[in-house]
Every structure is written in structure tokens, then in C-alpha cells.
């Protein structure tokens, strides 16, 4: 199996993890069910309590940072660019809420982008969430779609014993049926589109782009259809850029930073990222080994083994304000007493020590190109000003 296919397949486990946590009552996301593979019985999707709580903390933290970005100066139109969006349901909740004040772009491998566009076309509840007319450009490439097979987790890496308890059998994610595919019309010529990106869905406020992120390494290459460089913009990378080699990952971020800090742009770019890190300890090394046995490599785990290394990386790339916290810190510092009582009542967490150790190896990172000066590493301003209220570990 190719490395690209292995990385694409990790979205299946992320989806099942989110659905299991939703089904256990940690949050409400009824749209997740629409993305489940047809051969999966929703009633049989279960995860251990420590995984459900970890998924909840990850979803909660990313959502809070995104919501705060959108609510700060809420009368200003903003833009979200989600890298490796996969089966994320977030746009179908945010677009109806913010409508003309939000432009939302999702980038993923072409096959994943195509599958999501097909799913939107199939389900009215998804299509109706998108303001304005929706255009589809779903074509059949030379190679037909193949079922997506569940591989290794995008979220958590259990121990061998925990993996054996969680029922990690194969799961297939079939592309949606009943959608007429057709050749692309009005598509860029090969000379205009040397990297073969495609846009299987577009609307006045929502685009799905099929593109290999490794081709987005220059300011010109990130100028995909519909991206507005004059808008305050948030990059979202949930376990996405970590699959690239560090130099490639840095180049992608640098390309977006340069594009958004040019004289004609907004100079207002932020990032919210979720990635594992090794902590350069035994548990981190076991995580890396377990991933390797499944064909998965996450190069950034060793290249940036600590929260401080990731924050220094963001600042070095041009995010003048940057902060971070591991999921254990976020769990303890961001969840208020009432919410903690609620989630404590959902499931008995016998494995608290294991939970703390596990989530301490996953980090949430946030940063922005605002302010322009380097006077403070935590001086969030403008559309990112609300982030100053979030407790930070680094």
C-alpha cells in the first residue's frame, strides 16, 4: 500500500473515534453518522472511555479556538482553510451560522475531496447547510475509486493490549453512490494546473479542493480557486501536516504566510494545529514504534519533540504570537467545573493514569501573524485577540 493511501485511510479511524465519543454523549454531532461506511453498524461503534474522553478534549479545544476567532470582530468576514479536512463536519455547522461572513475551504487528497463532494450531493442536510448555489465537478479519473480501508488511528495510538480490546478490525469506506460523474468542464489546462488540483465542489462560501499538500510550497501554488487573501484567515491542521517531512511541512506553512503577508493581502493569518509529539521519552518512542508497525510515519514527532519546539517552530516561520498546551493540560485547565461533572458522569474512567500519560503526548498549538512586532510571544491582536484568554502551557 502506498504511503499516500495509508495517510488517507487514517481519516476512517478519526471518524469512528469522533462517532464513538458522540454516541457516548460527549458532544452532539448528528451529521457524523452520514459519513460512516455503509458496512458499519452505528450501534456497534465503541471505544474505551480514555479514547472517548481524549477525542472530546481534542474536538473541544479546536472548536473553542475556531469559535473565538469567528466571534472576535464578528461583523468582519473571515476565512477558514482546513488542511486534510477528511470527514470533518464542522463546515456544515459554521456555514449556516455565519453565512456571508464566512468563507470555508477544505483541502485533501483528490480521492477524499471527491468522496466528500459526492456525499454532500447525496444528502440534502449537508447541501442545504451551504449558503448559495452549489456547483459540483465530480469526475472519474483514469483509476476508479476503491473502497477506503481503515488503517491506523489518526487520533490516539493505544498500547498493544488496549488495541486488542478496542476491536480494531477492518472497516471499509465506500464512495457515495447515485451521483452522476462527468468530465471536468472549464478546468485549468495542464499548463495552468501543473500539479493536477481539482475542485469537486464550490459555492460562494464553501470550496472542497483535491490537492496534494506537498505541491503547495510557494505563494503562487496556494492561490487555489476562491481563496481570498484579503480576509483574516485561519489555517486548521488536525493531524495533517505532521505526516509530511518537516522541511515540506514548514514549506507549506511558509507559502501560506508569504501569501497572506504580501502588500496586497490581509496580513492576518492564524493557525490552529493538533499533532502528537514524542516528548523524547519512552512512551513517545513506543508510540512511534507502534505506528511504524502499521506503516505509519509521523516525522514531526521526533523533529519537534516538545511543545516548546513546536512553538519555536511557529514563531520562526512567521507566526509572531504562538502558544501551546498538551491535551492533559487543556483537559485540566479549559474544562469548567460543570462541564467536568457532566463528562465524569458519562463513563467511568478507570484508566486515569493511562489517560494522563497518553494525552500528554498530543498538543494543541495556536499562533498568528498579528501583531507585526515581536514584542510579546503571546500578544494576540485583531481577529485573534480573543485567544489571549485561553490558558496556555507554553
Question: What residues fall within each predicted segment?
Answer:
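Conserved beta-strand signature within the Rossmann-like core of class I S-adenosyl-L-methionine
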Residues: 233-237, 259-280
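A short SAM/SAH-binding and catalytic strip from SAM-dependent methyltransferases
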Residues: 231-247
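A short, conserved alpha-helix within the catalytic core of class I
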Residues: 214-221, 242-260
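Short, conserved secondary-structure transition motifs
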Residues: 214-215, 276-285
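Rossmann-like AdoMet
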Residues: 1-209, 216-217, 223-225, 229, ...
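Short secondary-structure boundary/capping segments
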Residues: 97-98, 251-253, 286-291
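General small-molecule cofactor/ligand-binding pocket signal
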Residues: 207-209, 272, 322-325
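Rossmann-like AdoMet/SAM-dependent catalytic core
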Residues: 150-153, 160-168, 174-182, 282-394
Amino acid at each position: 500500500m502506498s504511503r499516500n493511501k495509508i495517510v488517507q485511510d487514517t481519516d476512517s479511524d478519526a471518524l469512528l473515534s469522533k462517532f464513538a465519543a458522540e454516541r457516548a454523549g460527549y458532544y452532539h454531532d448528528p451529521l457524523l453518522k452520514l459519513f460512516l461506511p455503509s458496512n458499519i453498524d452505528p450501534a456497534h461503534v465503541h471505544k474505551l472511555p480514555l479514547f472517548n474522553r481524549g477525542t472530546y478534549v481534542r474536538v473541544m479545544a479546536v472548536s473553542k479556538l475556531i469559535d473565538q476567532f469567528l466571534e472576535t470582530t464578528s461583523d468582519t468576514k473571515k476565512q477558514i482553510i482546513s488542511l486534510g479536512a477528511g470527514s470533518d463536519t464542522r463546515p456544515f455547522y459554521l456555514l449556516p451560522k455565519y453565512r456571508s461572513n464566512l468563507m470555508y475551504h477544505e483541502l485533501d487528497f483528490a480521492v477524499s475531496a471527491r468522496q466528500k463532494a459526492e456525499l454532500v450531493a447525496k444528502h440534502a442536510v449537508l447541501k442545504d447547510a451551504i449558503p448559495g448555489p452549489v456547483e459540483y465537478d465530480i469526475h472519474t479519473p483514469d483509476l476508479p475509486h476503491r473502497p477506503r480501508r481503515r488503517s491506523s488511528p489518526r487520533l490516539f495510538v493505544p498500547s498493544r493490549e488496549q488495541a486488542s480490546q478496542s476491536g480494531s478490525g477492518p472497516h471499509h469506506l465506500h464512495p457515495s453512490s447515485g451521483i452522476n460523474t462527468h468530465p471536468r468542464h472549464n478546468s485549468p489546462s495542464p499548463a495552468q494546473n501543473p500539479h493536477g488540483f481539482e475542485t469537486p465542489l464550490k459555492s460562494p462560501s464553501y470550496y472542497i479542493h483535491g490537492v496534494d499538500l506537498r505541491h503547495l510550497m510557494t505563494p503562487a501554488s496556494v492561490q487555489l480557486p476562491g481563496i481570498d487573501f484579503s480576509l483574516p484567515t485561519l489555517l486548521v491542521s488536525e493531524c495533517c501536516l505532521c505526516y509530511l517531512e518537516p522541511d515540506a511541512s514548514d514549506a507549506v506553512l511558509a507559502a501560506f504566510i508569504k501569501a497572506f503577508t504580501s502588500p496586497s493581502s490581509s496580513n492576518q493569518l492564524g493557525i490552529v494545529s493538533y499533532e502528537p509529539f514524542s516528548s523524547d521519552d519512552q512512551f513517545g518512542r513506543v508510540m512511534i514504534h507502534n505506528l511504524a508497525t502499521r506503516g505509519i510515519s509521523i516525522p514531526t514527532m521526533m523533529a519537534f519533540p516538545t511543545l516548546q519546539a513546536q512553538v519555536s517552530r511557529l514563531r520562526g516561520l512567521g507566526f509572531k504570537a504562538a502558544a501551546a498546551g498538551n491535551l492533559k493540560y487543556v483537559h485540566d485547565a479549559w474544562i469548567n467545573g460543570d462541564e467536568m461533572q457532566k463528562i465524569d458522569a458519562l463513563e467511568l474512567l478507570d484508566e486515569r493514569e493511562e489517560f494522563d500519560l497518553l494525552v500528554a503526548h498530543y498538543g494543541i498549538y495556536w499562533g498568528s501573524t498579528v501583531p507585526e512586532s515581536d514584542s510579546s510571544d503571546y500578544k494576540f491582536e485583531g481577529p485573534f485577540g480573543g485567544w489571549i484568554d485561553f490558558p496556555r502551557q507554553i
